[in-house]
């Protein structure tokens, strides 16, 4: 069975029925699902994406299309259904657009992609790249959660550990692609539990469940849980005892993060019960963001920074 797919580089590609299909998991990122499909079909993820009728190239070979993993459309849904039998609702649930109107503005992320600007800081989400919980990867067999791509993803509420930002072996941001960033690898199968970033033409072999990560502070875990409840629409947020829309609540959170950055270090002495580790991380992050003009409004630079902001700002 074939169905007309996404236009890529002026060429319309067609979806083909895949021999083996694995079902998406709850909360899984679209890219993660493509990786797992590639593994069971024993071919590179880019080949699976092509068979699913997805266009992976942007305006040129080194430009990644801004839509992939951010938002699906009718063409993508039809192509994916023809190739896998997965429903429109499940396809939509694997895209960052599920966070629209809350922690994310999809239109802003897409605009950043078209302008070739990094979105991981400016728009508070990483389109290409992700944080991860090594414990979750081990238990799930390599399912990467969609919310790990958000800049305020700090700790795993289930395993109570700080999320991993970078591979300790190659040093690259997880799932970024390494020296030759692409949407998904075109030359090798990317094991879902391994780094597999490109390093000198070969995939990094670091097995991520073996990486040691820090235990998370109890208060930070609770702050992350509350943040996730709002981000996923499970609770109605409030400000000053008044219920507000999720977009307003996240706008207030962003404003608090920016004001906290601008007020460092003096503001720390005026806030009650700030843990010492939070103060150290916040000061380090301020130096990193302040080293480049205009980045004070960007999202937390690391999982540890996100943990610090959640710990300090959420009680406010």
Where are these regions (language model features)?
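Basic, alpha-helical nucleic-acid-binding regions used in initiation and control of genome expression
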Residues: 1-316
């Amino acid at each position: 069975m074939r169905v007309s797919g996404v236009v890529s580089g002026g060429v319309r590609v067609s979806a083909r029925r895949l021999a083996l299909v694995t079902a998406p998991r709850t909360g899984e990122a679209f890219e993660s699902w493509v990786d797992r499909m590639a593994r069971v079909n024993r071919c590179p993820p880019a080949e699976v994406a092509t068979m699913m009728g997805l266009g992976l190239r942007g305006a040129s070979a080194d430009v990644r299309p801004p839509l992939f993993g951010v938002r699906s459309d009718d063409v993508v849904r039809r192509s994916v259904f023809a190739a896998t039998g997965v429903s429109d609702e499940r396809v939509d649930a694997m895209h960052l657009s599920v966070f629209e109107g809350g922690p994310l503005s999809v239109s802003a992320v897409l605009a950043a992609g078209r302008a070739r600007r990094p979105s991981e800081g400016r728009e508070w989400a990483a389109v290409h790249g992700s944080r991860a919980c090594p414990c979750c990867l081990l238990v799930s067999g390599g399912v990467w959660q969609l919310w790990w791509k958000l800049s305020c993803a700090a700790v795993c509420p289930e395993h109570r550990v700080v999320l991993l930002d970078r591979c300790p072996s190659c040093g690259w941001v997880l799932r970024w692609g390494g020296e030759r960033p692409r949407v998904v690898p075109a030359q090798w199968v990317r094991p879902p539990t391994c780094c597999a970033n490109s390093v000198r033409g070969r995939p990094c072999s670091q097995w991520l469940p073996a990486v040691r990560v820090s235990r998370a502070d109890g208060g930070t875990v609770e702050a992350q849980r509350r943040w996730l409840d709002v981000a996923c629409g499970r609770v109605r947020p409030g400000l000053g005892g008044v219920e507000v829309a999720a977009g307003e609540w996240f706008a207030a959170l962003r404003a608090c993060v920016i004001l906290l950055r601008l007020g460092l270090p003096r503001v720390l002495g005026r806030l009650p019960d700030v843990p010492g580790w939070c103060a150290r991380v916040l000061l380090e992050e301020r130096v990193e963001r302040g080293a480049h003009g205009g980045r004070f409004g960007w999202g937390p630079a690391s999982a540890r920074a996100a943990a610090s902001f959640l710990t300090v700002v959420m009680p406010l």
